[in-house]
Amino acid sequence: RKMSRTSMETYKIRAKAVSDAEIMYGSFAIATLVGIGIDSPTVVGAQVANELLDIDGIKASFVLTGVEERVYVSARSIDEVNVQKIMEQFGGGGHLTVAGAQMVDVSLYDAKQIIKGTLQFMKEEGDI
């Protein structure tokens, strides 16, 4: 248990990201995280993505972590949503329940809008 402990500051950052997450269609959670001043920001983003799946009704989570001119997307899901297919839309990949992608030269806000638009399009097409 001691090895998996985290600092209070990192815990607060994760808690805020979870608390501020936006829910789409009642089952997709999207959170953002500014990676400045955080040790291992992409790891923290992945932890938030995992934590969001603990919320009742959430089938997939997407955490966008902004670091300099890059946005890292950590995607997680319960078996019925294939996040690999979603992340492939951005040149990323992974596995059915764990995937990721990177977006370059895009703001955190714009990256979130792109993810939301992609989810909307894929839902309308019946892909998710």
Feature roles, as predicted:
Residues 1-128:
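Hydrophobic helix-and-loop "lid/oligomerization" segment in the mid-to-C-terminal part
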